[in-house]
Amino acid sequence: MKNKGKKKKVWEKWLCLDIICIMLILVGFSYKKIEKTTMETENFREIYQEDNKDEAEETKEEKEGEDIEKEKKKVALTFDDGPHPVYTPQMLDVLKEKGVKATFFLLGEQVEKYPEIVKRMSEEGHLIGNHSYKHEQLSKLSSVQACTQVNRTNELIYSITGEYPEYLRPPFGDWKEHLDCEVNMIEVLWDVDTLDWSSKNKDKIIKKVVTNVEEGDIILMHDSYESTVDAVTEVIDLLQKEGYEFVTVDKLILE
C-alpha cells in the first residue's frame, strides 16, 4: 500500500511539472508574439511619422512656392507696329531665350507682308493684338473707315492664327467711340512709354523703363528698331532681378 501511495505522488509531481512546462511555453510564445507586435507597431509608427514629416515638408514647400508666385510683381512687355522683317524675328529670339511671353499689336499691312512671322508669334505663345491696318488715327476717320481698319486686320490675323484678336491698341492711343459697325474688343493702352521710336538709343530706353515701372504696368515699345531689341535683353534681366515677372496683357487685365 505504501509503494502505491509513493507512485501516486511521483505521478502527481510529473503532472505538475508538465503543466508548468506547458504554461512556460505558452507564456514564452505569448511574450514573443507581444514583442513582435510591439516592434511592428513601433516600426509602423516610425514609418507613419516619417511619411507625415515628408508630406508636411512637401506641403510647406508647395505653400512657400505659391507665396513666392503671389509675391512676384507682374508687368507686360508690348510691341507696336510690327511685324518688322528683320527686328521682329530678333525680338522673338530674345524672348524665347529669356523664356518671356509678350504682346504684339500688329498692323494689318505688315501682317499681309510677313505672315510667317505672325505664325511664329502665335506658335511661341505670344499674345497678338490689333493695331489697325495702316496706323491711321481712328478718331479722324469716318466710322466706316475706322471699322475697316480694325476688321480688316482682325480677318488677316485670323487667317494666319485661326483666332480673332480680342485686344486692340488704337494708333496714338486715340479710340473712336460709338462706331457704326460692331467692334467688340478690349482697348489696351500703356503705363510706361519708352519713346524708343524717338530716341533709338538703348540706354535711354532702359532708363525709361527701370526708373518708371511699377507693378501691374504695361510697357510700350516697338519691334522695329535694333536699339529696342538690344534694350529688351537688359530690361528683362534688370526687372527679373527686382522680382518682376513678365506676362501678356490679358493676364494683367483678367487679374
Predicted features along the sequence, with ranges:
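Terminal accessory/targeting
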Residues: 1-69, 73-75, 93-102, 215-255
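Generic detector of well-ordered alpha-helical packing
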Residues: 19, 81-82, 132, 197, ...
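Active-site beta->alpha N-cap acidic-glycine motif
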Residues: 42-141, 145-146, 152, 156, ...
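Catalytic domains of cell-wall/extracellular-matrix polysaccharide-remodeling enzymes
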Residues: 136-245, 250-255
